[in-house]
């Protein structure tokens, strides 16, 4: 990782890993330091403890239980959704800020990511038409009921970029390890909604906030939002 962007990437990953470590000590390698090479003054690094890892996937019950514990115990310092620094999805910056509601956070950050995607790939009338309906109708329908009519959700610390490439097993302890974090305080359902949250529900480690019937729509909205930084960094939707 190079230059100013590389500096921001390693420093935000260090803060993400450090924040997770404070809540779930055994779930991540200990983050030790980040900085710049003395002899390569434009090259950045992040240093974590060595953990002997295997590429096996974790147990379907044990891993969701540990992630659900992270979500329960990782509380936002100001009660809001967001994160104090910009994190990165690959090379794409995610400018979180702080927001009072999950709908507000999701809408604002997704709009910025869509704009970045369009700048990277060029304007696309079909996507722009879709995005108008996405923000006016699709997003409010499953998200707004979470925080209306007396309902509320608590911002939870999440890994932020969880997929099988960022999960391993400790060869010595047999326990799951997660790394390459890009954390923020979110609605916990958005932590890989199609995989981890369903595992957690099946294992009885977390519960689906009412209205439960909208859970699939919320998962789909999160999946759509996650496709924008992928497209901005790579080859299009």
Question: How would you name each of these model-derived features?
Answer:
Residues 98, 102-104, 111, 115-116, ...:
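Active-site Asp-x-Gly
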Residues 59, 124-127, 216:
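Residue-level recognition of alpha-helical structural elements
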Residues 11, 129, 133, 200-203:
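Conserved phosphate-coordination/catalytic loops
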Residues 221-230:
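Hydrophobic alpha-helical segments that form the core
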Residues 233-237:
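ATP/Mg2+ or Mg2+-diphosphate-binding catalytic cores
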Residues 36-39, 75-159, 170-173:
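An alpha-helical support segment within catalytic cores of ATP-dependent transferases
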Residues 1-104, 108:
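ATP-binding pocket architecture of kinase catalytic cores
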Residues 15-18, 140, 209:
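Short, well-ordered amphipathic alpha-helices
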């Amino acid at each position: 990782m190079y230059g100013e962007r590389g500096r921001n990437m390693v420093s935000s990953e260090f803060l993400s890993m450090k924040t997770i470590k404070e809540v779930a000590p055994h779930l991540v390698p200990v983050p030790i330091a980040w900085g710049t090479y003395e002899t390569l003054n434009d090259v950045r690094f992040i240093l974590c403890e060595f953990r002997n890892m295997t590429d096996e996937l974790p147990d379907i019950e044990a891993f969701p239980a540990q992630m659900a514990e992270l979500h329960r115990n990782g509380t936002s310092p100001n009660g809001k959704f967001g994160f104090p620094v910009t994190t990165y999805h690959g090379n794409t910056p995610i400018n979180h800020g702080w927001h009072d509601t999950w709908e507000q956070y999701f809408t604002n950050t997704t709009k910025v990511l869509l704009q970045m995607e369009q700048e990277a790939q060029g304007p696309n009338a079909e996507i722009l038409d879709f995005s108008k309906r996405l923000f006016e109708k699709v997003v409010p329908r499953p998200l707004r009921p979470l925080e209306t009519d007396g309902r509320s959700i608590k911002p939870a610390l999440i890994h932020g970029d969880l997929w099988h490439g960022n999960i391993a097993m400790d060869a010595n302890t047999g326990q799951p390890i997660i790394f390459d974090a890009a954390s923020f305080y979110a609605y916990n359902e958005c932590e890989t909604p199609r995989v981890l949250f369903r595992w957690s529900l099946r294992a009885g480690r977390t519960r689906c906030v009412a209205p439960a019937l909208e859970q699939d729509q919320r998962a789909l909205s999160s999946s759509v939002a996650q496709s924008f930084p992928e497209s901005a960094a790579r080859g299009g939707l």
